[in-house]
Amino acid sequence: MENPTKYNSNELEYIKRVLNAESWSATSGTWCQELESQFAKKFDSKYAVVMNSGTATLHSALVALGVGPGDEVISPALTVIMDTTATIHANAIPVYADIDPETFNIDPKDIERKITDKTKAIIVVSLYGLPCEMDEIMAISRKHGIPVVEDNAQCFLSKYKGRLVGTMGDISSWSFENSKHISCGEGGIITTNNEKYAEIARKIAGHGYKNLKANTGQIKLNQSVYQDPDYKRHSEIGWNYRLSEPSAAIALAQLENIEKKVELRKAIADMFLKEIFDCDYLIPQKTPKYSNNSYFTLGIRYEGLKELGVSWQDFREKYVSFGGDGFYGAWSVPYLEPVMQTRRFTSRCPDIYKGISYSEGLCPVAESIQSKLMQFKTNYRSLELAKQKVLALKKTIDFYKETK
């Protein structure tokens, strides 16, 4: 089985068509519109708005929900910093909820504990491709009247109790960054069934042009109107988050092949999981029976220091020596990053962040697990290459079994 991680479908053909077209911009081309149409259909949504990154989609989603200065946004303590930066770009206050120690996803009970009268939105991240506990989360959302943003940057086609991830929150955000299931180098998209949210997000992504609508990123006006010196264009403060037509063409071709991409990542993850089945110090992310995992990466909690007396770093070094290509440590919990500890971000709205503390111990489960996580790749180009890495892991496990 070959891995369609980069391209092996219509990408090249679509790029040729873009190069032969008159416009490479979303404002007048057709590829961004087609990508939005097909993505909305695939993920059972009324509206889709494509943008140039997953961070842009998160920021636009928060603004569409009305998040602004002094509001609080709850997000998980174990994830990349982009949920935090999107919150800060909305001039809001990041609030962190701890995680479940087995699934590594946000803990609904801690979400509820962190809600205040300032909470304006909740971001939930389907970490590594595993859906969050959406029934509990949406019950909390309805109880308190707080909208939910699904950050599905790492999660494509996973299901939770039979429902497709991306169809349960108020807005869903996706990423087309280089390592994701769908990749066009950089890119992202939001989906929603709410026309108001889609229209605001569209305007935020398109310089705030007043004629942009939920279902189109193009402005169709008579030349005599928009060329008139008295014509007023902008109803919102917006950014240029538009995706280029070449990038949209690549992403569309990738979308057409998404089932195969997810299938292969699952197959590779299964190979690793079988190898560690009886290993008591390599504990994989727990996937509940009512969910499936699209395995953006395979997350494993390492307890070898306690069980073997072998550090995370030494285990990784041995794995590499046997032919493994290394595995990644999990990102530092966002609030312990230097930018948060030195509070450099507060210069934007200093009064808003007075008295806000992000000290160590804020989310103890996430802090404890983060340093133990191993993130094994699942986007190898072929099963044969993946088998070599699985064999390297087997040799590493066997080595420490013999020396134990």
Where are these predicted regions, by residue range?
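Conserved PLP cofactor-binding pocket of PLP-dependent enzymes
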Residues: 209-222, 271-276, 289, 316-373, ...
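Short, conserved charged micro-motifs
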Residues: 306-314, 382-388
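Phosphate-binding glycine-rich loop
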Residues: 25-72, 83-89, 95-98, 163
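N-terminal "arm"/small-domain region of PLP-dependent enzymes with the aminotransferase-like
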Residues: 1-25, 375-377
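Active-site region of PLP-dependent enzymes
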Residues: 23, 155-161, 168-297, 332-335
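PLP-dependent aminotransferase-like
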Residues: 63-152, 159
